[in-house]
Amino acid sequence: MGIRNTLDKLEPHFHQGGKYEKFYALYEAVDTIFYSPPSVTKSTAHVRDGIDLKRIMITVWLCTFPAMFFGMYNAGLQANMAIGDGFGALGGWREAVTMALAGSHDPGSIWANFVLGATYFLPIYLVTFAVGGFWEVLFAVKRGHEVNEGFFVTSVLYALILPATIPLWQVALGITFGVVIGKEIFGGTGKNFLNPALTGRAFLYFAYPAQISGDSVWVAADGYTGATALSTAAQNGMSAVQQAYSWWDAFLGFIPGSVGETSTLAILIGAAVLLITRIASWRIMLGVFVGMALTAMLFTAIGSESNPMFGMPWYWHLVLGGFAFGMVFMATDPVSASMTDPGKLLFGFLIGVMTVLIRVVNPAFPEGIMLAILFANLFAPMIDHFFVQANIKRRMKRDAAYSPATNEETA
């Protein structure tokens, strides 16, 4: 009651004519964090549902937690194993915090691994939230509309697809590009045709490739270099991957990679909740999976003596790189994806096909899910257009078939 009374007392100052009317978006954002919006439908409701945008976004945000927490643990585990092999710790305040809270770099300690991983991920997330939130609030204030809860999701998704060692100034630059160029210049939430989180990562990928790809960015240990499992497969074939990791290692997430993308199991836990609550589209996920599996099997059947990626089975494509994360959390973005039911299947299928094509055919990009989703975002409006037009023509033919009989009965 104390929070509600305080907010009610402050509310008049933020309405039109009040002292702080320009900052109503900030007041509204704080109010809706603690309480549901007071607006209700007073006339006939065309959409009947007990869930609003805030609950949807918070649910998606919570569904990333399994991947987030395991990602922090795995980032620390990979670093501590490297330190145990003789590589040095990176030092700085992270080392001081780790020693104060965990006392060692023991890779056998769950707590030590989690603390070290958290010292890398949490700053990334906080910088993402602060900088991206600043741009969200700035555009909301200038346009006079509410701050949307969608940034809760954008911020965590963006942070989870970055390597743990990325410089924080690049984190800020990437989320700025993703929010401003990927969303706000098109009108804000609901009007963007590109996924903002992937747009920001794509900017970093092409502008600063040394800090977001390669062999030295995945494990937070001084002097350590090591390719991801997907890069190893692209360079040396599946035999080299299987010597280093089992399929279960990759499925559970005990491999180097971006913070939130390594554990397919943790990602699928979040996917189950999204599907049960019907927040994410099963059609898109199914389309992505089927497109990937069929294309991978086609390349496996064709084979190649010069390109080892031809021989990667579909079940390895599933657990390596960011495929699972992209399929569950990125491809299902309701704003930038197709909206018609058959369009969702085709949209997802296109992503799955292009992911494997980029991974196998283009040696410059061992990871293909990011570019595949962004390309599919560009095609989504056209996909929906063709399906809508086909539906209109089908209905017109059906109406034309019934109209003569109707006219005769009337006469």
Swiss-Prot record:
EC number: 7.2.1.1
One of the Pfam families matching this protein, by short name: NQR2_RnfD_RnfE
GO annotation, biological process: respiratory electron transport chain; sodium ion transport; transmembrane transport
Keyword Membrane on entry: yes
Membrane-spanning ranges: 56-76, 121-141, 161-181, 254-274, 284-304, 309-329, 345-365, 368-388
UniProt family annotation: Belongs to the NqrB/RnfD family.
Function: NQR complex catalyzes the reduction of ubiquinone-1 to ubiquinol by two successive reactions, coupled with the transport of Na(+) ions from the cytoplasm to the periplasm. NqrA to NqrE are probably involved in the second step, the conversion of ubisemiquinone to ubiquinol.
Protein name: Na(+)-translocating NADH-quinone reductase subunit B
Biological source species: Chromohalobacter salexigens (strain ATCC BAA-138 / DSM 3043 / CIP 106854 / NCIMB 13768 / 1H11)
Source organism phylogeny: Bacteria, Pseudomonadati, Pseudomonadota, Gammaproteobacteria, Oceanospirillales
